[in-house]
Amino acid sequence: MTDTTPNGLLDAFWRYEAALMSNNLGELDRLFAPGPWTLRGDAVGLLVGHDAISAFRAGRGGAPARSVEELHVRAIDDDAAMIVAVVRAASGGRGQQTQLWRRGVDGWQVAVAHVSAPARVVDGTIWRIVGTPLVAGTPGGAAADEADAADAPDSARNAAGDSAGAPEPGLSGREAGSLDGETVAVKDLFAIAGFAVGAGVPAYLAEGRPATETASAVASLLAAGADVVGIARTDEFAYSIAGRNPHYGTPPNAAVPGALPGGSSSGPASAVALGQASIGLATDTGGSIRVPASYQGLWGLRTTHGAVPVDGLLPLAPSFDTVGWLTRDGSTLARAARASIPGVRRELTPRYALVDVSAAFQGEGQAGAGDGQGGEVERAVGEAAARLRAAGIDVDTEPVDVGDLAELAESFRQVQAFEAWGTHGAWIRQHPGALGDEIAARFGAASAVGAEEAGGALRRLHAHAARIAALAEDRILLLPSAASGAPDARATPAQLERVRSATMRLTCIAGSAGLPALSVPALSVTSVHGGRAPFGLCLVGARGSDLALIERGREVAAALTV
């Protein structure tokens, strides 16, 4: 260390501050060292390389206003120095910024930076409302709800089908105290007594009345001892898998800074990935649990259709709406599922088969938004299957054909659209301008799907569903959880529509047949900003095999991480 500040360093620092406050992207790019070794980190994650840092800045819309209160320089030599700045945000609170500056042919540039922003009480992109807790669970579980399979609603008891098996000895649907100490982020579609449902739409929330009863899916977790920490954001009316909300902002992707979090269960997913909750209570109609789980490296379960009661849940497309959970590990997911699914367990033979999904990626666009990754995604899943075989797990050598994926996805889209408009169309007509452009356009297209068209699509869908269900009777299907890694947060609507179309050709396989689907965070693909991004391997099981599917998923994850 030297005792003097190198010439020109402070001038460069103050140029950086001025550029930051004016959002001068060109100057900021010049003041950060070029190349793949430049680093910028904060509480959300680490950006590696100049290009990733530049893309992050371009997508965030400027830094919050602040002033520098203290400045500490520690020179390393004539051409390198550390600067630690204490900053005060205009909105209140203090933070710190640590930078390693190096002098080269282009003058002083930042090589490494770490930002500690003033602590936010609540991140409004993730949460609608939080408490400490918002709703307390029942410690030691639940005398309050001693329901077992015999007392469960008929819809839940029958969801597993005739072959689901008998209640497992000693297991109740809600295990007393099994979730003590766990915290839950509840997607803003579930009723919680005393709070209105907002569904990601401010105008809908403004007219909502506080619920008088709590949804069964929430009550089950509370009865097992979990606390509800808050109500988490969703895409508008849950009609998206991107994770963007034009009213409240985009929740951060904890695994890939600068990328989309995935939706529509974006808030619960980000809350869990960031450690702000241990369980995300969510819904999955066309992939809204599996996609954010894949994008953020989480475990995510779409349950058998009807396995978890949906009373107190704002629907989108009832034929496909399911309840499920997002967690950071398989053990917590298993406990959440046991606390919520009546005590009927169907076992699964540990036999697996890859699904031929090559048709899902036809017509992809250029890479850069996360689309165009079909080849890499297929290779990753194929290599995973080979590794499972090498570990002694029974994986069929030939992929299975689930039928015409394009026709399946289009039939699914038409039925989903018809039901979505039936659910929300009247309200949308009465509230022009209440939705953002992308979701408004999607509902506009849904309004054009008539009953005759939807009826034909439903008949085709039933034929596809029967074939898929038959394939899943004696093997667990393996396929990608999504069509790509997390797209760039700056992706255009056209780019996201391509990603959505390819992903829906995958997610509708389980959704059309009402089968449970588990996203296991066992794979990775190239990140949109370089490096690696998490990616989910999806396991699809027979109806009613939800609990066994999680256990098989844990075995698969263990085999792939050896």
Task: Annotate each predicted stretch with a short phrase.
Residues 8, 39, 47, 51-94:
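Surface-exposed, charged secondary-structure patches
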Residues 10-21, 29-45, 284:
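Short, solvent-exposed secondary-structure junction/capping segments
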Residues 75-77, 84-85, 99-112, 117-269, ...:
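Gly/Ser-rich catalytic/binding loops embedded in alpha/beta enzyme cores
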Residues 116-125, 279, 285-360, 366, ...:
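Structural helix-boundary/capping segments
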Residues 119-179, 339-504:
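Amidase signature
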Residues 186, 228-233, 281-283, 398-399, ...:
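General beta-strand structural signal in soluble alpha/beta enzymes
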Residues 269-279, 511-513:
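Alpha-helix C-terminal capping segments
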Residues 334, 455-562:
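Glycine-rich, small-residue loops and helix-cap segments
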